[in-house]
């Protein structure tokens, strides 16, 4: 059921129970405080009182006066009505009965060279109202000096707005403010001077030389493309200016088939040379799907060629790896002996 006063949600039973328990605890603590003040202190507290009555009693004992509207001040030092009206919105003024004494004007942690540029926040006398105009003039002149290049220093009496302080504004020491250091470009200018005609960064040139050295000396399980090797060799031979050819080796050619199953159905070329071709021309052929045949640009050494080539008919080539039974396709009968019979009871013996 919604409350008549507002349109908020209805608190649950657990929330209502927590609120009741919290309120009972608060009232029990307040009752003990009131009982102690009545028993052990000179406090005139009514039987049913709230926190305001306790605060009034404590202020009276401390020598303060609390009026019915809540105005509180020391006894015998009642401030004027105009000052009481401005207590909430303005800073308190110096009073002989006030416990808050503002710091005297003109004091600052840094010596100020210009006294006319100080700004007093929170109001003051009539003579201080005209100090804003010189400060704005100083600020505008300082901005022109910074933007136009005639002066790169802030004035020594540059004022800052304090965060709620009513004392004199804090001024920085009479020195130039910290300046962002200029980026050092000597190394880049030197490199640009020596490599004026190159359009590639240093890592490209180094990468080209390393790619050529790796492709010519280090063994690789995936053989590089001849186009990439030629580009790397040209990049290493031409230096930094011709290193663009090395990057050209990374371009993907669109002339080849885009189907991922092309390499599975296309018959791979025979990279093992004429000897393996002659040995594989018998009735037993090699399976292209199971044999370790790579792409068309594979270049194998003679030792690896002799070590990993399959044996031919009758084992003519010694030292070769013998193909296991599943690697070879046995053709026991010729193609003319094969016949497709569909639902016929005739057999080869009946013919």
Curated annotation (Swiss-Prot):
Single annotated GO MF: DNA-binding transcription factor activity
Keywords from the named record: Brassinosteroid signaling pathway, DNA-binding, Growth regulation, Transcription, Transcription regulation
Chain segments carrying region Disordered: 1-24, 69-126
GO term, biological process aspect, one: DNA-templated transcription
Biased composition regions of type Polar residues, renumbered to the chain: 90-101
InterPro entries documented for this protein: BES1_N (IPR008540), BZR (IPR033264)
Domain of life: Eukaryota
Family of the protein in this entry: Belongs to the BZR/LAT61 family.
Name the record gives this protein: Protein BZR1 homolog 4
Gene designation: BZR4
